């Protein structure tokens, strides 16, 4: 309501790949937040309100709190073994600058109800471990195993969402099947 009352042109909900086929409560709440946010476009009166609600979905932001790389660097700088769940685990990441640029691109393209997903390459924990060991040295690995609610491989778009997805330049654009106004140039 605050966005509508203050005539905000575009409202952006920033989400995570954890929202795709969630296995735990965190992922489920991210999915629900994303759906509620973009579905807001279905309930506004376009004659009264001009606010467009869009969402962005990406992986880990490099250097953010909870990101694995700073944790690994700290362990290696302290000459401790790396604590990993599974070296075959894959994740997606985006830098702060890439995330900022992506937000700007999405605001330029957004018509309302879309979920914007950057094209990101997956990396494995083994790739990260190898690269960091080359820089800081190898102090061993403590494999603790995949934790409850974790996925071995995150995904950015579900199979069901693919039916409503546009492949557009450096991104994928998921349209709302109930309120799709997006058409790429």
Q: Where are these predicted regions, by residue range?
A:
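Strand-loop microenvironment adjacent to phosphate/nucleotide-handling motifs in alpha/beta enzyme folds
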Residues: 39-185
